[in-house]
From Swiss-Prot:
Disulfide bridge map: C41-C115
Chain intervals for the UniProt region annotation (Framework-2): 53-69
The keyword Phosphoprotein belongs to this UniProt entry's keyword annotation: no
Region (Framework-3): 78-115
Gene responsible for this protein: IGHV3-43
Region Framework-1, residue ranges: 20-44
Primary localisation category: secreted
Protein name: Immunoglobulin heavy variable 3-43
Region annotated Complementarity-determining-3, chain positions: 116-118
Ig-like domain segment(s): 20-118
Organism: Homo sapiens (Human)
Alphabetic keyword roster: Adaptive immunity, Cell membrane, Disulfide bond, Immunity, Immunoglobulin, Immunoglobulin domain, Membrane, Secreted, Signal
InterPro entries with a match to the protein in the record: Ig-like_dom, Ig-like_dom_sf, Ig-like_fold, Ig_V-set, IgHV
Quaternary organization: Immunoglobulins are composed of two identical heavy chains and two identical light chains; disulfide-linked.
Region (Complementarity-determining-1): 45-52
Length: 118
């Protein structure tokens, strides 16, 4: 499969580990443009609700691109212009989990998606 195909794209997920801090992403799958996908990130090894959390992505052959952030309490959210109105970031501090709901997906959303802490 080539990334240039206009009818499907792959959103891949990697696991990120840094010392005792662990962020494990899940939810990657092949989706048709116009479809929806929800990514999850399970955090451990730090006090999750003390931190602003981010989603970043890396498209094939490109550098890292910041996607979105959410404040420690979920009260403030910010988005890159490229995803504004289509993506929604959320968190559940009781589950130490971060989410990214992605709607109206486009071929240019094809990337590796990572969660990150401040």
């Amino acid at each position: 499969m080539e990334f240039g195909l206009s009818w499907v794209f792959l959103v891949a997920i990697l696991k990120g580990v840094q010392c005792e801090v662990q962020l494990v992403e899940s939810g990657g799958v092949v989706v048709q443009p116009g479809g929806s996908l929800r990514l999850s990130c399970a955090a451990s090894g730090f006090t999750f609700d003390d931190y602003t959390m981010h989603w970043v992505r890396q498209a094939p052959g490109k550098g890292l691109e910041w996607v979105s952030l959410i404040s420690w309490d979920g009260g403030s959210t910010y988005y890159a212009d490229s995803v504004k109105g289509r993506f929604t970031i959320s968190r559940d501090n009781s589950k130490n989990s971060l989410y990214l709901q992605m709607n109206s997906l486009r071929t240019e959303d094809t990337a590796l998606y990572y969660c990150a802490k401040d």
